[in-house]
Swiss-Prot record:
Function (record text): Specifically methylates the guanine in position 2445 (m2G2445) and the guanine in position 2069 (m7G2069) of 23S rRNA.
Reactions the enzyme catalyzes: guanosine(2445) in 23S rRNA + S-adenosyl-L-methionine = N(2)-methylguanosine(2445) in 23S rRNA + S-adenosyl-L-homocysteine + H(+); guanosine(2069) in 23S rRNA + S-adenosyl-L-methionine = N(2)-methylguanosine(2069) in 23S rRNA + S-adenosyl-L-homocysteine + H(+)
GO MF, one example: RNA binding
Recorded GO CC terms: cytoplasm
Descriptive protein name: Ribosomal RNA large subunit methyltransferase K/L
Keyword Transferase appears in the UniProt entry: yes
Keywords (A to Z) from UniProt: Cytoplasm, Methyltransferase, RNA-binding, rRNA processing, S-adenosyl-L-methionine, Transferase
Domain THUMP: 42-153
Length: 711
């Protein structure tokens, strides 16, 4: 069985590891959560023990939902008497995107109506609504026409541990605090005899969470006490009581052995008073020392090593905050130089202001605020580039840097909303700096940034010296803005009329980087070939197809490295078939599938000429993707010209559609003209090109065209 654990953006990989450690069969990180394979007991264990999850959602039903009537009908089909007891209360949380239903509250109301009407028709008492503390809390996820109705097994946000009685302004959520501690290596440091220090502790969230973690206290134990998290009729009450009994035994042993190695201070006496009250309620007051002092007066703890955790304040007064962050960095280097630090900073600029060299950087979200988490190990290692002496950029390079920063700000909300980690940051925005800059963020390890720079051929009238200078200025600007060394910048040249050079090898690095898109892990090679293995412009189309492929058969023609197949499979496709003439690309596709644990008979790879294969094949598919090359002259198949052959190709593909199936056809030939009359003989065809272009490709929206065909 599959269920979903949601979390704050940036915690997905940590949460996946945590759920696997708790016993889940499989955990796959996706946007703002993790898809989990396991039994109901695994989900209930996550409710009790997960320090990172926001909610644990157990699915009841999933169905196509093009409009509000379909939503009502899909909910009304469920046997609500098997889920909700007479006299119990109900609440619905809804999340909608990319659908005809645009208001979450309205969607939630339609679900309540469907539940109430269904129970009335069965002659049962109408359930009441209780928004604060319902017996059954339902969750709707409605995305791109697909609805999932789930039970919120935890009954609400899991970050509420039950110990927070007093708080300072803008407290840090407990699950985000747990992430800061885990990234900083606190569990291992405590086991090795190290200490924990927060010099700006506020109401004590980081320290209390750290103490409970060290004492092996289940996060849900105090939250629920003797109550059940949910009164859903399918909840395994006996299994829950067994989990709670085991947790209480571990709690008793862990608290008795808890060492007094945790130290917190703050310049605000009211904050320290709140921290002490919270620690008392949490039962860890004896394990934490609290004191009132300014950050510059910090005393060195008795432990030789340990972890500094801190969430320094940040607001609109960047200059004042930068001075505070600099003082924090200076103090830590003097007081605890051999300790590790895990600092949750307001943004990358404030992180830089500490003067500390970050061995690792992570992007996290504190509510809606994008934050930079830096991990320094040890604190004493100086940063290579002094804060006061950044590399000076030329006037031209500064123009490029300014444009890059402007674009990053422009894309910020969109990237956060859609979970985009690989994107085009610049596309010849300044004509004299004619290149494209693509950003690839590593999905594993320390989440490093790589840049893929494609230099466009300059007109012959421009002197070669000017071309070289401008390229060097562009590269200097990109390296500064993204803070990447030269060895993580791949430079390519795209030129016309160079015979077979377009697909030749560039370097012999054989360096594979794992990236993530739509929840799928993908292998890219940024250095060795002109193309990387991932066409970023097709991102929205791949997302649409993945959503529509759940429980359906997906066919990928001219599959290249199989990214669309992998994303469809990760989204829950019943099967995928990937066809390409290149054995190299099919092996790449196989590697991508294996990377996501998807290798097997459900995912078929076919080495063949796609057109010939279509005309001989008899199987049918529900979703087909056809993205052919403009030209192909392989020795193993007849020459292919998309303009000349597209009607024949599309006719053969439409013939393989199952009833109700859909074919997506795309190509990047700028002079391509669809034979509308020819296609109309066998299919209905709609140009959907505008909807397949994300904000990072809007400057050159003709990078591809796309059509939706149905029989």
């Amino acid at each position: 069985m599959k269920f979903f654990a949601s979390c704050a953006k940036g915690l997905e990989y940590l949460l996946a590891d945590e759920l696997l450690a708790l016993g889940a069969s499989k955990a796959t990180a996706t946007i703002s959560g993790v898809n989990v394979e396991g039994e109901l007991r695994d989900a209930q264990r996550a409710v009790l023990w997960s320090r990172l999850a926001s909610r644990v959602l157990w699915p009841l039903s999933e169905f196509d939902c093009p409009d509000e009537d379909a939503l009502y009908a899909g909910v009304a089909e469920l046997p609500w008497d098997a889920h909700l007891s007479v006299g119990h209360t109900l609440s619905v949380d809804a999340h909608v995107s990319g659908t005809a239903i645009t208001h979450a509250r309205y969607a939630a109301q339609r679900i309540k109506d469907a539940v109430v009407d269904t129970m009335r028709r069965q002659g049962l008492e109408r359930p009441s609504v209780d928004v604060e503390s319902p017996d059954l809390r339902l969750n709707l996820s409605l995305r791109k026409g697909r609805a999932t109705i789930s039970v919120d097994l935890g009954g609400g946000p899991l970050h509420r541990r039950g110990w927070r009685m007093a708080q300072n302004e803008a407290p840090l959520k407990e699950n985000l605090a747990a992430a800061v501690l885990m990234r900083g290596g606190w569990p291992r440091a405590y086991a090795d005899g190290g200490g924990l220090l927060d010099p700006m502790c506020g109401s004590g969230t980081l320290l209390i969470e750290g103490a409970l973690m060290a004492a092996d206290v289940a996060p849900g134990l105090q939250r629920y006490g003797s109550d059940l998290p949910s009164r859903w009729r399918g909840f395994d009450r006996n299994g829950w009581q067994q989990l709670v009994s085991e947790a209480r035994e571990r709690d008793s042993v862990g608290r008795a052995a808890l060492k007094q190695v945790i130290h917190g201070s703050d310049m605000d006496p009211h904050a320290i008073r709140a921290a002490k009250e919270n620690a008392q309620v949490a039962g860890v007051a004896e394990a934490i020392w609290f004191g009132v002092c300014e950050v510059g007066e910090l005393q060195t703890p008795p432990q030789a090593t340990g972890v500094v955790v801190c969430n320094p304040p940040y607001d609109e007064r960047l200059a004042a905050d930068a001075a505070l962050y600099r003082r924090l960095g200076d103090t830590l280097q003097c007081a605890v130089p051999q300790w590790r630090a895990s600092l949750l900073c307001g943004n990358a600029e404030l992180a830089y202001a500490t003067g500390l060299r970050a061995g690792k950087k992570y992007q996290l979200f504190n509510g809606a605020i994008e934050c930079a988490l830096i991990v320094c190990d040890p604190i004493a290692v100086p940063r290579r580039t002094p804060l006061a002496a950044p590399t000076a950029l030329s006037e031209g390079a500064q123009m490029v840097a300014n444009r890059l920063r402007k674009n990053l700000q422009k894309f910020k909300k969109w990237r956060a909303r859609e979970g985009v980690e690989c994107f085009r940051a610049y596309d010849a925005d300044l004509p004299e700096y004619s290149a494209a800059i693509d950003v690839y963020q590593q999905a594993d390890g320390d989440r490093r940034i790589f840049l893929h720079v494609q230099e466009y051929a300059a007109p012959a009238t421009i002197p070669e010296a000017d071309v070289r200078r401008r390229l060097n200025e562009l590269l200097a600007a990109a390296r500064e803005v993204f803070e990447v060394p030269a060895e993580r910048v791949a430079l390519k040249s795209r030129e016309r009329g160079k015979g077979g050079s377009k697909y030749g090898r560039f370097e012999q690095r054989n360096e594979i980087v794992h990236v993530r898109e739509h929840g799928a892990l993908l292998r890219v090679n940024l250095f060795d070939y002109l193309d990387t293995g991932l066409f970023l412009d097709h991102r929205p189309l791949r997302g649409t197809m993945a959503q529509q492929s759940r429980g359906r058969r997906f066919l990928n023609l001219f599959c290249y490295t199989g990214v669309a197949s992998v994303e469809a499979a990760v989204a829950g496709a019943a099967s995928t078939t990937s066809v390409d003439l290149s054995g190299t690309y099919l092996q790449w596709c196989a590697d991508n599938l294996a990377l996501n644990g998807l290798a097997g008979s459900k995912h078929k790879l076919v080495q063949a000429d796609a057109l010939a294969w279509l005309e001989a094949e008899r199987a049918h598919f529900d979703v087909i993707f056809c993205d052919p090359p403009t030209f192909s002259n392989s020795a193993r198949a007849e020459d292919f010209d998309i303009q000349r052959a597209h009607v024949r190709l599309l006719r053969a593909a439409v013939a393989r559609l199952a009833p109700g199936g859909v074919l997506y056809f795309s190509n990047n030939f700028r002079r391509f003209k669809l034979d509308e009359e020819g296609v109309a003989e066998f299919a209905q065809c709609e140009d959907i090109s505008p909807s397949t272009i994300d904000p990072d490709f809007e400057r050159h929206a003709r990078i591809h065209r796309a059509w939706r065909l149905t029989a």
